[in-house]
Amino acid sequence: MDKSKRPFLKSKRSFRRRLPPIQSGDRIDYRNMSLISRFISEQGKILSRRVNRLTLKQQRLITIAIKQARILSSLPFLNNEKQFERTESTARTTGLRTRNK
């Protein structure tokens, strides 16, 4: 068949299948902080299943484990990086303010 007759065929690209984020030996548990921390955003939110590439059952178990860890104070509910930064106290240079009438 001539190439001009089939202009919309795409060439087949080989692709490498991604490794699953949770291996078969990993235990989904609230004590397994190294595993849980991979599924939390920088702000402390639980990442969605589409982002994590987890199955429905795995996502449910991860969510439960994260919530248990938060309740038991292993994880913070909010991850505010502002609280860890040192805030410089600004000294008041002006004395008493005078009212302009």
Swiss-Prot record:
Signal peptide: none annotated. Keywords: Chloroplast, Plastid, Ribonucleoprotein, Ribosomal protein, RNA-binding, rRNA-binding. The keyword Chloroplast applies. The keyword Transcription does not apply. It holds the Pfam family Ribosomal_S18. One of its GO terms (biological process) is translation. GO terms for cellular component: chloroplast; mitochondrial small ribosomal subunit. GO terms for molecular function: small ribosomal subunit rRNA binding; structural constituent of ribosome. PROSITE patterns: RIBOSOMAL_S18. It comes from the Eukaryota. Its main location: plastid. It is found in: Plastid, Chloroplast. Belongs to the bacterial ribosomal protein bS18 family. Part of the 30S ribosomal subunit. This is Small ribosomal subunit protein bS18c. It comes from Vitis vinifera. The gene is rps18.
